[in-house]
Amino acid sequence: MLGLLGLTGPLTQAHADPGATPQAYPIGGRILGLETICGDCTVEKFTSECTGLLEAPVFDRAGILWLVGILKGVIWRVTPDGHCTVGVQLPPEIKFPAGLRFAQDGTLYGVAMGSGLFSVDLSSAKATLIANGATLGGFPDGGFHGLDDIFIDHAGGMYFTDAAGSSVFNPVGQLFYRDAGGNISRIISGGLMFPNGVVLSPDEKMLYIDEWGANRILAVPVIAPGIINKGFGYVFATLNGGHGPDSMTADSSGNIYAAHYGSSEIVVFAPNGDYFGAIHLPAGAGSDPTNAAFHNGYLYITEMAQHTIWRVKTKIPGIMLYGGQ
């Protein structure tokens, strides 16, 4: 969706064999192997102190990890030694937080499945609901069904997925964009099967949206901030097994990393859709990774079923985000 540094006892580790035959994603595509991504891909347990269905890991410039406990209604604060404390207790009007991102000015923004878009002033630990799709930033039809994930571009705008109520049999999921001035537009009005993660390529010319309900990742060209070319959108990758892709991140080379919920793995794709392989969590780690975030040479992975954060050393730095690497 800890305690690696300063704790006694052996690390919990798993090794992905770069020479092993991984699942074929996509069918007919090239399989590149993980050596250039994470070497032997040793996965270490970082912490299991945070609870409440973990999601949305983001790092600030000081190296503090922030993430949500969905059921607890909190934003956890995790220090570099893996100690987890409540950083922000969300107010009652912000229900089921699901995604977080830092803006350029250091403000933390988030989306909540039961509420809408919110901002957080970390200096005061105060969270404020800023758009709910109805009375705040409203649309005549009520706007939001239930927001799931968020990504902030270099223009200060925010893409966020609207997933609640959508599925493979009810493809009513949406995508919204809030520009730097606070204006919200609906840029995909239905047709998505539980849109979950959303991320931009490093040059911000391609937007990736994954559909949990369809077990696939879509790609659509970006014309300008908040303006996409749906006529040239396509299926970027189709996953096998599990339930579906949850949230995503990207590295500085444009490779896409998707948390494959139900499969205990992070799947990695090249910008052209070729499949590198799957970074597997260790046996017994839980099957439900929800998200991943780069920091200081590692990819940190949240796993929901056992409220644990794992990490794997990577060879390519992550996409530059406002919180810092």
What positions do the PLM features span?
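A short loop-to-beta-strand structural motif that recurs across blades of beta-propeller domains
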Residues: 74-76, 116-118, 173-176, 216-218, ...
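Short loop/turn segments that connect beta-strands within beta-propeller blades
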Residues: 79-83, 121-125, 178-182, 221-225, ...
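Glycine/small-residue-rich hydrophobic helix-like segments
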Residues: 221-290
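A short beta-strand motif characteristic of beta-propeller blades
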Residues: 42-48, 83-90, 126-140, 183-189, ...
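Short loop/turn segments immediately following the C-termini of beta-strands
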Residues: 70, 112-113, 163-165, 212, ...
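Beta-rich, blade/repeat-based domains predominating
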Residues: 47-65, 70, 91-116, 135-158, ...
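A short helix->beta-strand "capping" segment at the edge of beta-propeller domains
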Residues: 20-52, 233
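Beta-propeller domains
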Residues: 66-89
